[in-house]
Amino acid sequence: MHSNPFLTQFILEEQRSIPSATGDFTGLLNDIVTACKTISHLVNRGGLIDILGAAGTENIQGEGQKKLDVISNDIMVNSLEWTGHLGAMASEEIEGIIPIPGQYPKGKYLLLFDPLDGSSNIDINISVGTIFSILRCPDDVSEPTQEDFLQPGTQQVCAGFCVYGPTTMMVLTAGHGVNGFTLDQDIGEFILTHPNMTIPEDTMEFAINMSNQRFWAAPVQRYIEDCLQGKEGCRNKNFNMRWVASMVSEVYRILTRGGIFMYPWDSRDPDKPGRLRLMYEANPMSFIVEQAGGVSSTGDQRILEINPEGIHQRVPVILGSKNEVERVIAYHQEA
């Protein structure tokens, strides 16, 4: 018998603390949780039911899709379009926004999601996950357009991710701290196991793809060189490097023990401002990290203050332990 609250109970208790709450937000979160449970089940059984491997298609980003990318996207859409809580959706896998079919009622929220982050790892049994961001639909809008989604990250109502690893974990923030829930497979419920998650201000761990070092801008080169010099250098401590190529895994590690994650601009394609998507990855993860006491930046700007220009806009991402990210920001200011 669990003494900690189920996620459903936790959400309802939060709702009761807000006198004006109607239950729509609670209902939406519960629907997202249900979709993530379904994806978790398929990820766990992928090799047994022949849903691993390439789908033979590309997404809007021009990236080859895995079978589970397509299946996970369909699960999110099919689980949420009929509920009456959403005005529209947007997916990293789809070019335009996803309207709510006419036969279903429309709600007051907009949902953006990456249905299976890190899916390049799925065939080699490394953790993947689902990332989502909830925005309010403008009050006077009955048929949302893409422009209605172009809100800065500071306007997010809620952000979360579900990581499908040795255990399935759901991490959530609604702007009042960060909480983590573990899926009990026996009863099919998420249990609060990591209340009030906080990122340590200091760290001795960085995550970056070192194979791209020659393409980085000078401030990032300088920061990483400082770390690599260890105790003998200006940092006076030894650092460890991590790189999983799965943002949900990287951010979850930072939430539990600190660290800095960097996916900076590089000169391989200098006209691209970055690699990660602002609306589906950078904004929700930045909201979570900041609510846990961390910092998130492009190096030059707070990510949550970026005014989006498109739903598939890309940005550089530097996030994690406060003192490390602020050091990288300072190096950019000095450059």
From Swiss-Prot:
It comes from the Bacteria. Its main location: cytoplasm. It is found in: Cytoplasm. Homotetramer. Mg(2+) 2 binds at D114, D117, E281. Binds 2 magnesium ions per subunit. Its EC number is 3.1.3.11. This is Fructose-1,6-bisphosphatase class 1. Keywords: Carbohydrate metabolism, Cytoplasm, Hydrolase, Magnesium, Metal-binding. GO terms for cellular component: cytosol. It comes from Nitrosococcus oceani (strain ATCC 19707 / BCRC 17464 / JCM 30415 / NCIMB 11848 / C-107). Pathway: Carbohydrate biosynthesis; gluconeogenesis.
